[in-house]
Amino acid sequence: MDLVTTTEQTPRAPRRDAAANREALMAAAVRLLNVDAAVPLEAIAAEAGLSRRSVYGHFATRDDLVREVTLRGAARIGVAALPDPVDDPVVQLAALGARLWSEVEHVRVLAQLTVRGPLAAEVGGALAPLRAFLRETVRRGVADGRMRDDIAVDTLARLVEGAALTVLDEATARDLDSAEGHRLVMLAVLAMVGLGWREAYELVRTTPELAVAPPPGPQPPPADPRPAATRPTVTPEPAA
């Protein structure tokens, strides 16, 4: 009688170069989509140092690549933009706006694509922690008498989110610098919850937690995400 043996197949881990190529594509997409939301797939592949054909080993379509980039970015922002807890809900709201700005100001076009583009509904899950934090902050502010109570909390929270996104739109269209965007997003959300412009200005000016963070010190250049074989070779100049 023949003996039949079965061997359980263990899925192979992805090759290191395949994983590196995928990350290179993602990084290239972030850079180029932040300049032009309609950038073609060929340009993204070239930026990553890959052929268009090789892209299809990772993403079946350009839309799939954009979707992956968008959802990953939204998941990061949904967690990273949460500020430290503050007792005063008004200061908390301003800090939330400032923290969100700091997370997206360097990728403004891509951030707009994330929250206003065709994937807005899909990224809702990734942004849920951020929106829940916003709603709770507004609820506390209304309960404490620090924010307007003539609008339902859920509606007011959505209006606050809209005010912050309007600042993002304006900052992108006019290329506002980081400090101005930081200031405007706080003033916009504070105005939406009922603070007068003078009160909001003084709060932002005198609250240390709301100050613009100092620029980071010199950082080493980022690693080139392209495969080593595709990187340009730099030939040293001959000595004089």
Predicted regions and their residues:
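Amphipathic alpha-helical packing segments from all-alpha helical-bundle domains
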Residues: A95, L119-D169
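Short hydrophobic/aromatic patch on the recognition helix
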Residues: G49-F59
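C-terminal peripheral helix-coil segments that are non-catalytic and often amphipathic
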Residues: D2-Q9, E136-A143, D169, A173-A240
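Short hydrophobic clusters on alpha-helical segments that form packing/core surfaces
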Residues: L25-L32, G73, L100, V104
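Basic, helix-initiating cap at the start of DNA-binding domains
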Residues: M1-E47, D63-R67
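Hydrophobic alpha-helical connector segments
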Residues: E68, V79-V109, V115-E122, H182
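Short, hydrophobic secondary-structure boundary micro-motifs
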Residues: L41-E42, L110-V115, R146, D150, ...
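Alpha-helical DNA-contacting segments of helix-turn-helix folds
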Residues: F59, D63-G73
